[in-house]
Swiss-Prot record:
Catalyzes the hydroxylation of 2-nonaprenyl-3-methyl-6-methoxy-1,4-benzoquinol during ubiquinone biosynthesis. This is 3-demethoxyubiquinol 3-hydroxylase. Binds 2 iron ions per subunit. The lineage of its organism: Bacteria, Pseudomonadati, Pseudomonadota, Betaproteobacteria, Burkholderiales. It comes from Polynucleobacter asymbioticus (strain DSM 18221 / CIP 109841 / QLW-P1DMWA-1) (Polynucleobacter necessarius subsp. asymbioticus). It holds the Pfam family COQ7.
Amino acid sequence: MSLIDRFIAEFDTALRSVVGGAHSRRPTPGSGEISHANLDVAQRKHAAGLMRVNHVGEVCAQALYQSQKMLARNPQIQVMLEHSGQEEMDHLAWCETRLQELGSHPSYLNPFWYAGSFAIGMLAGLAGDRWSLGFVAETEKQVENHLESHLETLPQEDLRSRAIVDQMRIDEIEHGQAALHAGGVVLPDPVQKVMQAMSKVMTTAAYRI
């Protein structure tokens, strides 16, 4: 693929992440379940808020994987990041579809989330592959924790959302393990704490906006 073709492909990914229209290569989990099964207004609103948070997380994931893939020194790491990024695109499409089914919308702050995450990913990439992969692993670990907490509060009747979140959780675990196996280092505790604080701001805002 030429440099121009790569640029067009990456720009298309960025546009689909921010504006919408992501395509999934895998079927949407829970697609055989009833879309709004016995959800009252409050339950649907809560489910939509959580799925919006998850959608923002996938917007950020696209930015992180794109920027870190651009700066990866090792071609094998680039391939690994590309594979994980494609599965994250599935997640993005699933969340987007579920938000539409719930009569809601993605976060209005998606351009901000994408730009900020892209910049952070560039910084991680500049630090070198081992630190960049460590950042991926820690990010996926925190996302896994968020998804587990969502499974605890999503309405039991919302089988479609729950199926999506559970499959995302499984994928995130695999992505984090792949990053560590590829040579990622465990990030220092202060860095983990800063990442957790930033994540808290993002999830709180995305739930509402």
